[in-house]
């Protein structure tokens, strides 16, 4: 997947919102979910389309992603975004995630479960 600087920044900003306090593997996993959605054909066909799809990632709809993107995401989130864009997937193909405490079956990484 070819990605512009803006795509990397936007993905990194989402990662920071959703997993900024998680370990690096947890940050990468959030990026992998976006890329898995992009490749699936069941979601919008651009990184921004996936991130801003209505009802999917609350921080995007609430303006937090745009704010972090404008101010520059932290370096670990940028690195995770770049690695996810490079097709690195530590979730087993997951297209969704939620809090691990939800009890949902899936791959648990940090405080999230990916499915």
What are these regions (language model features)?
Residues 2-115:
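Bacterial extracytoplasmic/cell-wall-associated proteins, especially those involved in peptidoglycan
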